[in-house]
Structures are given as structure tokens and as C-alpha cells.
């Protein structure tokens, strides 16, 4: 007997192939996209503009399954953080950040993270596996159903757990669905992928997906970036910066956004700002300064407000569009760099971290009753 297929795990092209294999016209794929993503229907029997024989055919050959809600927390500032349970019982985190007329969903791409950035809680938890397409787009599907009016998803950022470009195929397919007119209909300007700088995948992304690009920079030189982002030892700044400079075509109004976490005494001095100015001198870009969000066991501390202000002014005086990202959801460990999830670490990285610190830093998350 042929194994049933989770339709959420199919790209648009694969869904069309599945429809053709069922002897149906291709417009059925569009109908399914609308039922599943726009209307949130996963029960084929309720898809009333499909014929009864086709609905029966679908139920025999396929299903629609999303991750399930394990826990939810809501911050004092309105930020929502969800812990989603996957079929293998690993759990990932997804965050929704409301802001006036805008609602940004921060989506995870891996169970844990394959990288080990020193300032990020996810990296200290280790790594289990890549998420499937169904598990990535399923976060968007679930969030859209869990949010109550007036909250609405207007933007998606691939900035949750994991390095998106180390899960390229599933992430790009999911972002395509986010922008698809018959799914979530988001503009390419409202879907952003953040990467630590996986150079080959960045080159491929530039050719294959129109989404906005953000780069986790966090340091103005290789020596410091090697400490903060070990991936830099493989893909150094002399490879990363030229690619960012030429990522969008000349004359385009679009530019790369650089993310720069502000860590006291490490990368927040005036000399660091001046070095950053020289590094990015000919790169069309925006710069987001991110106050460091602490997590248990880290020795890092956030820069002072005055240090951040001086740093920002130095960059702005040099002509850089620079903003300080307002910290959201830190009271529920939902801010940038704080996502951890709950999963089995296949790398042993988390256990080494625990042994080094002397105790376990897994944080229990209280549930909200539904």
C-alpha cells in the first residue's frame, strides 16, 4: 500500500505533480492551496468545491498535518511565543511581534541550530535536524489560526531557531508559499531571511528567491567575528562583504540589512563603530543595532543605552541608515537570541555547555490554557 503524503510537505511544483498523478487538472492545486492556507481547512470532506470522488481520493492518498501547540506565553508588550511539538516529539519556538499596523512572525528553520554563535541561546542548546517544509510553513499556518483579532501576520522573518540557508530547499519552498497569491500573499518586501553568511547558499538565493536579505554581522573584523560566529572561520568578511555589496542589482532601491548585536565591552566601542564604517563604506545597506538579550549561563552583558546611542550616532553621522531594534518579548525569553525550544541534541554541544557552566539551563515554560 502506498504511503500517504502530507500535502503541506509539497512545494507548489510537487503539489501540481501530485494532482497530475491523481488524474486531476492542475487548477485543483490552486484550490487546495486556497483551502489549506487561506481558509485553514485540513479536512478534505469540508472542501465543498471539490467533487466528492476527488475528496475521497485525496483522503485515501494524502493528509494535512501541522505541528501541534504545546505551550503558549504572551508578553506584557503583546508578543506571543509558542512552543510547537513536532511528530518526533521535538519542540521548536515561534514568535509573533505586534507593532501598530504591523505583525511580524519569527519562524524557525531547524530543531536547534547547526551553528554555535556565542551570543545566542539556540546555539547553546545544540542541534537535532532540519525542519521539513510542512514544519516550517506549518508555523505560519498555526500562528494565523491562533492569533485573535486585531492581530494579523503582515511580515515573516526567518530569524527563529536555526540557520535558514543550511536548510535551503525547505526554507525557499516555504517562503514561496508565504508569497503565493493563493496561500499567504505576502510581498517579497515583507518576507526576510536572516543568515550568518553561508556564502554558496547566499549566491543561490540571490538567483532563486526575491525575498529581503538580512545578514548577522555583529563584528567589524574577522578576529572578533570568529569568536561570535564560528562560521566566519569558513566564510570570512572578505568573502561576505563583497557579496552583500552586489547582492541587489545596481540602481535597485533594495539593500541588505546588517544585524549587529550590542555586547558591552566587546563590540560596542567607538573604535568598533569606526571600523564598521570602513568595512561597509561602499555597501548599500541598513544597520539594525540589537541590544543583547541575556540568557542563563552567558557571561555577555548588554551595552548601556548611552553606548548604543553613541554608536548609532557615529554610524548615522557617516551616512548609514541605522536604527536600534526595540527589545520585545524578553520577559518570556522570546526576544532575539533567546529562543531555545526543547529537543534532543545530537551534537553533545548542550551537554558540554552544561558541564562548563555547572548546571542545566533548560527553562520550563508555563502553559496558557486554551
Curated annotation (Swiss-Prot):
Q: Where is the active site?
A: 93, 336
Question: Which cofactor does this sequence's record say it needs?
Answer: [4Fe-4S] cluster
Q: Which domain of life is it from?
A: Bacteria
- Asked if the Swiss-Prot or TrEMBL record annotates the protein with the keyword Disulfide bond, the reply is yes
Q: Which GO terms describe its cellular component?
A: cytoplasm
Residue stretches making up the Radical SAM core domain? 99-331
EC main class here is: transferase
A single Gene Ontology MF term assigned here is:
metal ion binding
**What Pfam families would the database entry show?**
Radical_SAM (PF04055), RlmN_N (PF21016)
Tell me the GO BP annotations in alphabetical order.
rRNA base methylation; tRNA methylation
Under the heading InterPro entries, the entry gives:
Aldolase_TIM, Methyltransferase_A, RlmN_N, RNA_MTrfase_RlmN, rRNA_lsu_MTrfase_RlmN/Cfr, rSAM
Binding site residues for S-adenosyl-L-methionine:
162-163, 194, 216-218, 293
Subcellular location(s) of the protein: Cytoplasm
Q: Which reaction does it catalyse?
A: adenosine(2503) in 23S rRNA + 2 reduced [2Fe-2S]-[ferredoxin] + 2 S-adenosyl-L-methionine = 2-methyladenosine(2503) in 23S rRNA + 5'-deoxyadenosine + L-methionine + 2 oxidized [2Fe-2S]-[ferredoxin] + S-adenosyl-L-homocysteine; adenosine(37) in tRNA + 2 reduced [2Fe-2S]-[ferredoxin] + 2 S-adenosyl-L-methionine = 2-methyladenosine(37) in tRNA + 5'-deoxyadenosine + L-methionine + 2 oxidized [2Fe-2S]-[ferredoxin] + S-adenosyl-L-homocysteine
Q: What is the role of this chain? A: Specifically methylates position 2 of adenine 2503 in 23S rRNA and position 2 of adenine 37 in tRNAs. m2A2503 modification seems to play a crucial role in the proofreading step occurring at the peptidyl transferase center and thus would serve to optimize ribosomal fidelity.
HAMAP family named among the record's database cross-references: RNA_methyltr_RlmN (MF_01849)
What protein does this entry describe?
Dual-specificity RNA methyltransferase RlmN
* Gene (UniProt): rlmN
